[in-house]
Amino acid sequence: MDKSILKKFAIESREMLMTAVENKLNKYYVDEELEKTQSGDLIILKNNRITLQPLTFEEFNKRTTLISRIKDLSEDGSFENGKKRVIEETAYTWFNRIVAIRYMELNDMLPLTKDNQSLGIRVLSSINNESHPEILKIGNLTNTGLDLKIDFDKYNKLINENEQFNYVLNLICNKLGTIIPQVFDGITDYIDLLLPENLLSDNGFVNKVIKEVPEGNFKEGVEIIGWLYQYYNQIEKDRAMSSKGVYKKSEIPYVTQLFTPDWIVKYMVENSLGRYWVEHNGDKDLINNWKYFIKDN
């Protein structure tokens, strides 16, 4: 596992995704007072300066949730601070989700059937290195084993492959949220709304994952997720630790939640709980399978 590649990728990805999320957020003019009118199945929001692109009822409700979340996350009561926190939260969420999907698709672990089994279909890439994700092939979207609630009328009205991909990706995240809620669930309405655009473009995040992190790194074990988490937060961790004041609530995860490699966990367990068990139960045969246990002289 090439950690220098992972570090460079994660640090660059943070900036890339935060910019993309901020651009998406700005399209909804969440800091504007807008009047609401209804036109058929759509909601029109406007004032004397701007008019938003018509929203569906679902999008309107997600925008409302987004505004509430901005207010809730603000650390100093200002709307701008709340926006910054939402951008950070959303960017990390999509980083984590897409990286997790990449890990699962390369290890044939994507649980996309009703009984949560893999169909061997990639979501972000193609096994034959084609330029389009396998999941978007009509034969895969209509696979009877695929447990996604796809509205094909809605899907076919989307004007380009990036929009179609975002639609399917959100459905996949909803599916995975029933299985791995720690990564794919939570307060997701506004997270879905702020999914960055053009993920499949040459300079999009999905393309960055595929091209910059060799597949072999994802096949060396799940530790890659932990390293990417630590490197993603590296700059904020360094900044927070160099400050001399009291940590803000939002800074605490950066300085306390560090990735612990598998061997360190085993070392700690074998030489603490493991040692206690052997000393009190005499089950010394266990030691033969412990790689990091330090025997007494």
Label the predicted regions.
Residues M1-N297:
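Preference for the N-terminal adenyl/adenosyl cofactor-binding alpha/beta module
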